UniProtKB/Swiss-Prot annotation:
Compartment(s) where it occurs, according to its Swiss-Prot or TrEMBL record: Cytoplasm
This protein's name: Adenylosuccinate synthetase
UniProt binding sites for substrate: 300-306
Function: Plays an important role in the de novo pathway of purine nucleotide biosynthesis. Catalyzes the first committed step in the biosynthesis of AMP from IMP.
InterPro entries named among the record's database cross-references: Adenylosuccin_syn_GTP-bd (IPR018220), Adenylosuccin_syn_Lys_AS (IPR033128), Adenylosuccinate_synth_dom1 (IPR042109), Adenylosuccinate_synth_dom2 (IPR042110), Adenylosuccinate_synth_dom3 (IPR042111), Adenylosuccinate_synthetase (IPR001114), P-loop_NTPase (IPR027417)
Active site: 14 (proton acceptor), 42 (proton donor)
Binding site for IMP: 14-17, 39-42, 130, 144, 225, 240, 304
Amino acid sequence: MGKNVVVLGTQWGDEGKGKIVDLLTEQAKYVVRYQGGHNAGHTLVIDGVKTVLHLIPSGILRDNVKCIIGNGVVLAPDALMKEISMLKERGVPVEDRLLISEACPLILPFHCAVDIAREKARGNKAIGTTGRGIGPAYEDKVSRRGLRVGDLFNAELFAEKLKEVMKYHNFMLTEYYGAEAVDYQTTLDDALAMADYLKSMCVDVTEMLDQARKAGENILFEGAQGTLLDIDHGTYPFVTSSNTTAGGVATGSGFGPCHLDYVLGIMKAYTTRVGAGPFPTELECEIGDHLGTKGHEFGATTGRKRRPGWLDAVAMKRAIQINSLTGICLTKLDVLDGLEEVKICVGYQQPDGTVTTVTPLAAEGYELVTPVYETLPGWSENTFGVTSMDQLPQAAVNYIKRIEEILETPIDIISTGPDRNETFIRVSPFN
């Protein structure tokens, strides 16, 4: 009997999901992306060689794994082609292992133009999007004017639909934002030029996954971004445009939720956030500099510097609730090496002086709270590359145990470096 495992981020993204997906796919037959787009940045390091994937599932580096892009993903054909070319140059076979849902909404050049124009218009209230058209593409989907991958396979109908949607977006660009219009003919020609190539990879994803489940295959669902960026449950409006939580698996792939066996939440040993938005445990001091420098905290997609802070157990408890986490993978433990003390946020002090252990429902509430910390001794020993609990310094072991106690959730996997080998699995999600 196969296992169906979800791997997702529990914080504001950048938790190290790509590495863990790559590690676990040694036991999986299928890896499925179910939300987001090429705003994701999943970094894999294998034998010292770094690969950054934005759209293609991280299982692509395992020769025996089929990679699926589900209907919940907004797909930029040009970005997909670039990523495929990059992988092929490295000798990674792609076409016979990458499968795509025809129902994926398309990201086209006008989506990117609107995204950039909108961020510019927001001024100092900008959300900090990647500028890759993710939000506008999801807007088109919800408004029922969006174009999907399957539309490309009828050139005449696609041209008509494209003309209509571009009338709307070009009007917004020129009349509201004062930006340049996007050329219709160029957009049409470029999109149709990729139609046959995309068609060769399209399948009925729901049917394929159901057949794989019935055949007893192991399936891994790969989340992008993180729980606190979820459009419904995150620090709204400083969020992404998709459901990054476990509930997004079913809607974004057509896989029945009752068939999910294990949900693994990826959590850094501290917290980071990239872009704008509230961040109660943010450290704008030497310790923050230590975390940012030692952790190489720069966005894999945008290159922007990430904002570091202490581990936020209040936010983590909400992530555990929303996702029904089975277990946690703790990453970047080694980044805490050399600190005299480490802190865990165990509560939020509100303006009236009361302390809560429940997260606010919107960004404004986060901005009003002050973190309440529990302080533990740090450690000077090196944990980089350690692959068993008995090799860790006692202070690091105590930190891990205390996190488990506070969160009431087991830490089943621990990562102590960027390479797939710098990890130890205490409990495997597939066993």
